[in-house]
């Protein structure tokens, strides 16, 4: 019997210098990298897993966006959805100032559209209203506004980078057709994650972004003033990889795959299985809190 042993040789420690270091090569991380590279910055992404994609590659639906050019290619027939949302806002969230204000604005927009029904009806405020109701009213209104107000621009940005999500359909949590999905050469709707991630990776390669796989960041480096100036990571053979940078971007997602951390913040989820990618271990949160960052809503966990 011959035993084949894995190569246990430890690689040499290394140091890389860049303008920007990004932790996590999922959809957010690669988007940030492409954007920074487009501004002439040198970019390094540190990714703990052997492949890019994170949770994004697991997404099978599409991307929600309001007031897009692709929505206008559809005939509007979702009056009942709008009416139901306005009724829900009035009956269940009358004491929520944000939802009440959004519902008032949407009611005015809806009345104006009914008086002159041109194009496809949707608005940033209706998307905000749907999102606030979907979050049971505990969402951060400012973050919801940022998400919704920039959603159409995000669809346009993807288009500019050869990633087209032009099939618009209905989906849970939306009053109108708002989910944008990719279509293959045969005209069949396909999973957004497996479509988008390879194209984002291709854009990273074209932009000269360096992606370090199997490299787990475990410390944010700071200067004497407390400013983030890089990260320290561990490579696949245990070697130390130091990335010095002028800016650090954390796009590590949550901690749904770290069951100990899940139970710590929400004990009733003990024993639950997760749909998260293996890399969702909460490293980014732990690194950030180690240098003084605060946390919020830690019990709101995507399992």
Per-region residue spans from a language model:
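Gly/Ala-rich phosphate-binding loop of Rossmann-like dinucleotide-binding domains
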Residues: 33, 37
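Glycine-rich FAD pyrophosphate-binding loop
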Residues: 38-59
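Glycine-rich loop(s) and the adjacent beta-strand/alpha-helix scaffold that form part
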Residues: 236-239, 243-303
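N-terminal glycine-rich dinucleotide-binding loop that anchors FAD/FMN and/or NAD(P) in oxidoreductases
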Residues: 58-93
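Short, solvent-exposed loop/turn and secondary-structure capping segments
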Residues: 54-58, 68, 75, 170, ...
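Beta1/beta-strand and adjacent pyrophosphate-binding region of the FAD-binding site
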Residues: 11-28, 44
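Conserved redox-cofactor binding core of oxidoreductases
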Residues: 120-239, 258-261
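N-terminal, intrinsically disordered, polar/charged segments of Gram-positive cell-envelope systems
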Residues: 2-13
């Amino acid at each position: 019997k011959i035993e084949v042993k894995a190569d246990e040789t430890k690689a040499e420690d290394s140091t890389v210098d860049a303008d920007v270091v990004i932790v996590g090569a999922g959809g957010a991380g690669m988007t940030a990298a492409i954007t920074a590279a487009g501004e002439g910055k040198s970019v390094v992404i540190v990714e703990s897993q052997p492949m890019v994609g994170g949770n994004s590659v697991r997404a099978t639906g599409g991307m929600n966006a309001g007031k897009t050019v692709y929505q206008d290619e559809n005939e509007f027939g979702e009056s009942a959805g709008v009416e139901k949302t306005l009724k829900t806002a009035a009956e269940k969230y009358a004491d929520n100032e944000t939802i009440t204000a959004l519902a008032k604005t949407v009611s005015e927009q809806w009345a104006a559209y009914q008086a002159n029904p041109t194009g496809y009806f949707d608005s940033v405020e209706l998307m905000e209203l749907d999102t606030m109701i979907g979050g049971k009213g505990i969402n951060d209104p400012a973050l919801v506004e940022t998400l919704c107000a920039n959603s159409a621009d995000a669809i346009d940005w993807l288009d500019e980078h050869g990633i087209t999500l032009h099939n618009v359909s209905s989906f849970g949590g939306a009053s109108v057709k708002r989910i944008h999905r990719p279509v293959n050469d045969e005209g069949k709707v396909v999973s957004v994650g497996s479509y988008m991630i390879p194209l984002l990776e291709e854009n990273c390669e074209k932009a000269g972004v360096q992606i370090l796989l199997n490299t787990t960041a475990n410390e944010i480096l700071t200067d004497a003033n407390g400013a983030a100036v890089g990260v320290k990571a561990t490579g696949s053979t245990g070697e130390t990889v130091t990335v010095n940078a002028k800016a650090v971007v954390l796009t590590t997602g949550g901690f749904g795959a770290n069951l100990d951390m899940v139970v710590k913040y929400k004990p009733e989820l003990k024993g639950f299985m997760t749909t998260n990618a293996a890399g969702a271990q909460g490293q980014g949160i732990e690194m950030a809190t180690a240098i003084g960052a605060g946390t919020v809503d830690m019990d709101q966990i995507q399992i």
